[in-house]
Amino acid sequence: MLRFVRGNLLEAPVEALVNTVNTVGVMGKGVALQFKRAFPDNYQAYVKACERGQVQIGRIFVYDRGPLAQPRYIFNFPTKKHWRHPSRMEYVEEGLKDLVCRIQELRVRSIALPPLGAGNGGLPWPEVKQRIQEALEALEGVEVWVYEPVENPKAHSIVPLKTKPRLTPARAALLKLFGLYGALGEPLGRLEAQKLAYFLQEAGLDLKLDFACKQFGPYAEPLNHVLARLEGHYIQGFGDRTGISQIRLKPQALDEAVLFLADYPKADEAATRAADWVKGFETPYGLELLATVHWAVRHEGARDWASLQKRLQAWNPRKATFPKTHLQVALDALLKRGALRPEEWQDRPPKLPANVAQEA
């Protein structure tokens, strides 16, 4: 029996669940991220299978959790080769053929699957739905639940990792910086989290993040994996990256971080220093502006106004439109607060707008 339903796939009372994956061992968004958190044993087995080349288009990687587990089986269904690429309809079609074989081979009597490739994969749901119907409706004695696309899950409903990750100096300092930044109770988004982590590393704490200049300023993809691990234990609202993040510290998280940092004064000082650098720039645009100017001067050798403007124009059209008055305010703050050394800027000091100069 084939039925199309809505709700939480992970709560389906079935013998097997289908998880959509890529072939390179990454579960970073959407349904896959939910599975990674809910079934870490499956994730570890999937990563090892990818390393061995066992996860391929048209081949379901089945993970057996044992006869007493609910669900017993996780069917990892590749809908794309690389996590950066979109899903392809022919991959779904090939996978459905193997899915039918695996269901029959294992004598599965009930199974639930997501809208294969129609979420983050970008495939049109009506066409995917038709392929699913054609492939699975003829199965006899099998109850098939197909979960249709709905809005991205709310960040607070994302399943956290089952094991609380331990604090490290880097994680604790990041949590403290988030707490100082959000002292007024406002949540922060992924852009702000990226820029805060950038300044924390520039403040002297090696987070082992390799930042690069991206559309909205310095960006390090691995930071998202760090935040995903902290989600549900120390922070809430990061989500699965398919919607807007509204990150807040969970109750007691800041206290835990501060207590932990008592034994790591250098990490504690870096968090305090980074928080001081960003004062007055506590908006997504403000942090983007500040981090962009800092990056251009420190990492791309902009030493005067002409070279700074040239770097921004080469970055992208968005950066080229930053008003000079905004650049002056950002550069002045970075120099006066010690985020940039005096010798890093060889041109005349920034001339602040009259209203800003009076406030200073």
UniProtKB/Swiss-Prot annotation:
The keyword Hydrolase is annotated on this UniProt entry: yes
Family membership: Belongs to the DarG ADP-ribosyl glycohydrolase family.
Gene3D superfamilies reported for this sequence: Leucine Aminopeptidase, subunit E, domain 1 (3.40.220.10)
Impact noted for substituting G119E: Greatly reduced de-ADP-ribosylation (of macro domain fragment)
Active site: K80 (nucleophile)
Species lineage: Bacteria, Thermotogati, Deinococcota, Deinococci, Thermales
Keyword S-adenosyl-L-methionine tagged: no
Top-rank taxon, per record: Bacteria
Enzymatic class: hydrolase
Annotated phenotype, changing W83A: Slower than wild-type de-ADP-ribosylation (of macro domain fragment)
Primary role: Antitoxin component of the hybrid type II/IV toxin-antitoxin (TA) system DarTG, which plays a crucial role in controlling bacterial growth and bacteriophage infection. De-ADP-ribosylates DNA modified on thymidine by its cognate toxin DarT, which neutralizes the activity of cognate toxin DarT. Upon expression in E.coli neutralizes the effect of cognate toxin DarT. Upon expression in M.tuberculosis neutralizes the toxic effects of endogenous DarT.
Effect of K29E: Reduced de-ADP-ribosylation (of macro domain fragment)
Subunit structure: Interacts (via C-terminus) with cognate toxin DarT; this heterodimeric complex neutralizes the toxic effect of DarT by preventing ssDNA binding to DarT and consequently inactivating the toxin by direct protein-protein interactions.
Catalytic activity entry: an N-(ADP-alpha-D-ribosyl)-thymidine in DNA + H2O = a thymidine in DNA + ADP-D-ribose
Residue segments, region Interaction with DarT: 167-338
CDD domains: Macro_Poa1p-like
Protein species of origin: Thermus aquaticus (strain ATCC BAA-2747 / Y51MC23)
Record text about domains: The macro domain alone is able to de-ADP-ribosylate substrate in vitro and is almost as effective at neutralizing DarT in growth experiments as full-length protein. The C-terminus is a region interacting with the DarT toxin ssDNA binding region.
GO BP of this protein: peptidyl-glutamate ADP-deribosylation
Keywords: Hydrolase, Toxin-antitoxin system
Entry EC number(s): 3.2.2.-
Pfam families on file: Macro
Protein name: DNA ADP-ribosyl glycohydrolase
GO molecular function: hydrolase activity
Gene transcribed to yield this protein: darG
Domain Macro residues, every copy: 1-155
